[in-house]
Amino acid sequence: MRTLWIVAMCLIGVEGNLFQFARLIDAKQEAFSFFKYISYGCYCGWGGQGTPKDATDRCCFVHDCCYARVKGCNPKLVEYSYGYRTGKIVCENYNRCKRAVCECDRVAAICLGQNVNTYNKGYMFLSSYYCRQKSEQC
């Protein structure tokens, strides 16, 4: 399974906190849940456009919007500190950028965990053809 993880990270191009985001997702679901979201709907994975397909995809849309708000912080590259207190993910950074990016990832991981029942395998590796609509505003 470790080899699969390494291969997947190479294929999608690991950047700074992507591994951290994956661990937060796994903390709110079962191990290796992150793989389900590598290319899902119109927003889970790299980039995004169109209308989110379901609540799961909307979590990724909101995450993209959150990253857009902290753009000056290089959200895909910044590494942050986090921990767990009474079963909850807690961002442990005093640096504004690190804390903001951690919060984006924390909220998205919680959202994905709360909406796992909306996950539709039919939206995995969805063609961009189905995401051609004008994107919603953040």
Swiss-Prot record:
The keyword Lipid metabolism applies. Its main location: secreted. Expressed by the venom gland. Ca(2+) binds at Y43, G45, G47, D64. Its EC number is 3.1.1.4. It catalyses: a 1,2-diacyl-sn-glycero-3-phosphocholine + H2O = a 1-acyl-sn-glycero-3-phosphocholine + a fatty acid + H(+). It is an enzyme of class 3 (hydrolase). CDD domains: PLA2c. SMART domains: PA2c. Its cofactor is Ca(2+). One of its GO terms (molecular function) is calcium-dependent phospholipase A2 activity. One of its GO terms (cellular component) is extracellular region. It is found in: Secreted. Belongs to the phospholipase A2 family. Group II subfamily. D49 sub-subfamily. This is Basic phospholipase A2 DsM-b1/DsM-b1'.
